[in-house]
Amino acid sequence: MTDNSHTRVVVGMSGGVDSSVTALLLKQQGYDVVGVFMKNWDDTDENGVCTATEDYKDVAKVATQIGIPYYSVNFEKEYWDRVFTYFIDEFKKGRTPNPDVICNKEIKFKAFIEYANQLGADYVATGHYADLKRDEAGNMHLMRAKDQTKDQTYFLSQLDHAQLDKVLFPLAGYTKKEVRQLAKDAGLVVADKKDSVGICFIGEDGHFREFLSQYLPAQQGEMQTVDGKVVGTHAGLMYYTIGQRKGLGLGGTKENNDPWFVIGKDITKNVLYVGQGYENEHLYATHMEASDIHWVDDVVSRYGMEFHCTAKFRYRQKDEGVTVKLSDDGQMVTVTSDDPARAITPGQAVVFYDGDECLGSAIIDRAYNQERQLQYV
């Protein structure tokens, strides 16, 4: 049996069941485990309760239960500078950003690794559902987890070899159900704790509009069909995303009782374009352009400048077949779907896969239906 006692693993602990079981498993495997709670946002609510304080108490309880030291580190400044300002800037451009992808790249696997190194870490570990595989040349590859319904490679798609070489994902071979059972069997106080949802700085109560309006002034404007008919008033373009159905306040017409969906935005005119029907032609793109490309591995040497793979355009979506074509300088990518893709959203990540391997990702800029650019921003 391998003696892991001289290998220090610093675990990012959130106070949730996944990261708690991560620490537990590593402790059981004999590693020298240290727990660290990352405070990324001052999330005191209207009642003066800071959920981070409650979560830290849970970290302390779990760490004490399994017998490991624990610390708290404050990354509020790093988070503001590297993640939150990006989030707001994207909304100013009329886009819909995904802060989790950037947070993992900049905070959980950058600032956190730098801090863990100060604690003498050989590795860091998190409660993400993802797997790693090292090839014969020694390069690390990012792979999907066993529990495909919980797989989080989408959010880890901007990590690089240096980060992955330093990381352990102990939950790779477990389902969520099994993780909860492990927590119960060990008597962990968080065994039945609800999973956190939503963006950390908005919290679970989902007061998104209220929150965003503190940083960006909302400007009402017209809701129009693509042929210019005014059908309503929007509360501010930043509050809507492509393909959105809820919250439009529009009913059916005599001619058409289909529900309304957001099909586009014009940020210069402050117009929100809406259309009826889930299958509305204006919601479908044949191809898209994306930038801020990041490859986990050297994709060009493996596949060339043009290749076929699968992709996700949002986290919960099934993989879709796509053809990827890189620009000559490698800074832009054109992604052509095998079948037209619905509700492609600028600001979101398009994440590429070869089977179970996550190849990397890019940030969507524009979407097209044949030669016609969709009115997405």
Curated annotation (Swiss-Prot):
Please state where this protein is localized.
Cytoplasm
* Molecular function per GO: ATP binding; tRNA binding; tRNA-uridine 2-sulfurtransferase activity
Q: Which GO terms describe its biological process?
A: tRNA wobble position uridine thiolation
Entry keywords, A to Z: ATP-binding, Cytoplasm, Disulfide bond, Nucleotide-binding, RNA-binding, Transferase, tRNA processing, tRNA-binding
Q: Can you tell me which residues form the catalytic site?
A: C103, C200
Enzyme class, spelled out: transferase
Source organism (scientific name): Limosilactobacillus fermentum (strain NBRC 3956 / LMG 18251) (Lactobacillus fermentum)
Disulfide bridge partners, by residue number: C103-C200
UniProt site positions, description: Interaction with tRNA: H128, Q348
User: Can you supply one Gene Ontology CC term for this chain's record?
Assistant: cytoplasm
Q: Where is this region: Interaction with target base in tRNA?
A: 98-100
Listed PANTHER family? MITOCHONDRIAL TRNA-SPECIFIC 2-THIOURIDYLASE 1, TRNA 5-METHYLAMINOMETHYL-2-THIOURIDYLATE -METHYLTRANSFERASE
Protein name per its UniProtKB record: tRNA-specific 2-thiouridylase MnmA
Family classification? Belongs to the MnmA/TRMU family.
Q: What InterPro entries does the entry give?
A: MnmA-like, MnmA-like_C, MnmA-like_central, MnmA-like_central_sf, Rossmann-like_a/b/a_fold
Q: Which domain of life is it from?
A: Bacteria
Its recorded reaction(s) are:
S-sulfanyl-L-cysteinyl-[protein] + uridine(34) in tRNA + AH2 + ATP = 2-thiouridine(34) in tRNA + L-cysteinyl-[protein] + A + AMP + diphosphate + H(+)
Question: Key word tRNA-binding present in the record?
Answer: yes
EC number(s) per UniProt?
A: 2.8.1.13
| Role of this protein | Catalyzes the 2-thiolation of uridine at the wobble position (U34) of tRNA, leading to the formation of s(2)U34.
Residues engaged in binding ATP: G12, M13, S14, G15, G16, V17, D18, S19, M38, G127
Its gene name is mnmA
Outline the segment boundaries, as ranges, of region: Interaction with tRNA. 150-152, 314-315
